Amino acid sequence: MVYLPTLLFSLGEGAVVPLIPVIAASRGATLASAGLIASALVVGQLCGNIPAGWLVSRVGERYTMVIAGALSLIGVVAGALAPSLVVFTVAVFVVGMSAAAFGLARHAFMTTRVPVEFRARALSLLGGSFRAGMFVGPFLAAALLALFHTENAALWFFVVLLVALILLVLFGPDPEAQAAAADRDAGDVEDTGEAVSGSIPTIERAGVFRTMWRNRGVLGRLGLAAASLSAVRSARQVVLPLWGVSIGLDASSIALVVGVSGAIDFALFYASGQVMDRFGRLWAALPAMVLMGAGFLVLSLTHDASTNVLWFGMIAAVLGVGNGLSSGILLTLGADVAPQSEPAAFLGSWRTLTDAGGAIAPLLFSGIAAISSLAIGAAAMGAIGIIGAVGFLRFIPRFVPRRTLP
């Protein structure tokens, strides 16, 4: 009941996300406007993380998932039936906010309930469930397009998955209740009949913004390093296709290279968790950042080389390895440094930082490429990767001490 809802949501999201600009353009948007409408999903995720932290702390993970699923359902149906581009944009924004709440609910549950000895493997598997959906979703969308000849088919497919998800969460086994019952059983002690003296401690509910302020040190240091990882990951999705176009490859060749890179990435998601649980978080984060940072730096030097196509393929594979090695690291680090009594508010801030890094990087790369060149833009992404590696090297030992690791 932890991974299946994530897979269902990500399958639907993966089927719809590539088609958002296409649907917008088919309804009269210009190419520039279609890009802005597609960005409403990321903006919704950024805006949704902090409110989601508040919601999880008030109603719990299970009901947050139900609320997020219901809001997504409303958003997707509104998108399918939208009479105007404004309504469609709002619908995309709502789906983004709901995705943030859904993801944070699972993250918070795993943070409090999964033993630290195999936390990284569990969270890497959670991240792998999301990656599986985002990887398979576009292929399902292509099949639906071929079958029904309309982009709305992917939206209605998402609706079906959301209905199944809501029913599963409402009526399936509740891992939250099961874990709480296990905790009560483990905590049972013999009643000696003696009076209890002294005060009984209670958990203070700090609130979202007070939690952010109390944890400003870790958020401003390790959180920014994590945001740089998210930035480099996101840049990969933009740099590789544009680089392929700039060196003269056709669309099918670019798709093949990017697809192979994605397959390598997906194949390594569980290995990342094994490395983190056995050797420590730094042994996954540092190689991943060094590989991706160095990969972008090397790529920036190969644009005009006679073997640029070969270099493009090799660097795409290296970036896939780096991204795969980092699978689950942001979830795991967030869980490691979150207050264990009430992590949701902190995780909302943590995920806002990492999502912001992922949102800013493509804009930064595009801006640098527009005023200079793709090579300089790629080099800038490589520099962010190396700086992030230094940040992890400095701050993971400081904020994730060895006592939290096996």
Language-model-derived ranges and their functions:
Residues 176-222:
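Juxtamembrane intracellular "pre-TM" segments in multi-pass secondary transporters
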Residues 1-42, 221, 225, 233-243, ...:
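Helix-loop boundary and gating motifs at the non-cytosolic
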Residues 154-170, 378-394:
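Symmetry-related core transmembrane helices of the 12-TM Major Facilitator Superfamily/SLC fold
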Residues 93-130:
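Cytoplasmic helix-loop-helix junction between adjacent transmembrane helices
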Residues 48-60, 268-281:
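Helix-to-loop junctions at the C-terminal end of transmembrane segments
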Residues 60, 81-83, 280, 302-306:
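Helix-breaking motifs and short loop linkers at transmembrane-helix boundaries and internal kinks
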Residues 63-77, 283-298:
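Structural signature of the two symmetry-related core transmembrane helices
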Residues 13, 95-106, 318-330:
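Core transmembrane helices of Major Facilitator Superfamily
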